[in-house]
Amino acid sequence: MKFVQLNNDDKISELNNSVKANKQVFLLIYMEGCGPCIETRPEWKKIENVLKGKTNGKKYNNVVIAETEKDNLKKLTFLKNEPKGFPSMKYISNKGSLQEDFEDSNTKNKTRTIDSFIEWIDSKLKAEKYQKGQKGGKWSRKYKLSINCRRPRGFSQKNYCKYGRKTKKNRTTYK
């Protein structure tokens, strides 16, 4: 887990390299003199202390938490578009191809407090964990039973009939 204040070119290039290395980046973009930004920045800085206390496993190893002033946006090569307003909190992963704003996330609590930020970060890390598994949806039991293995349609049904279907002989019944 890394916390970065993007105030010089070295730190900005370090963040660009972190995105290229497929790290999960949580970025706060603020503007000097902005009232909501002034209120949000101290809450964002508390994330460091809270997450350092929670690092009991490998959950946060691939995480970078950064903050930058709006003037540095042109130097950030991975940003697709400029923020709609300030402050703007972004989640960036998959080498910059996945970008989501805090306001567009599925978290219930969207207030700019430490609790809502931690909830957002944890929800993104859980979602990332489950994305690597099965692709596509599960077949329902009704659909599986409707497949005619004497005349399967398509590659998936053929493979299901060949490898996945349990015949009545192989099924176990629980009493």
Cite the ranges covered by each PLM segment:
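Local sequence-structure signature of Cys/Sec-based thiol-disulfide redox active-site neighborhoods
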Residues: S13-G53
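Non-catalytic, surface beta->alpha helical segment in thiol-disulfide oxidoreductase systems
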Residues: K84-K132
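Thiol-based oxidoreductase modules, predominantly thioredoxin-like and allied folds used
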Residues: F3-D10, I29, R41, E48, ...
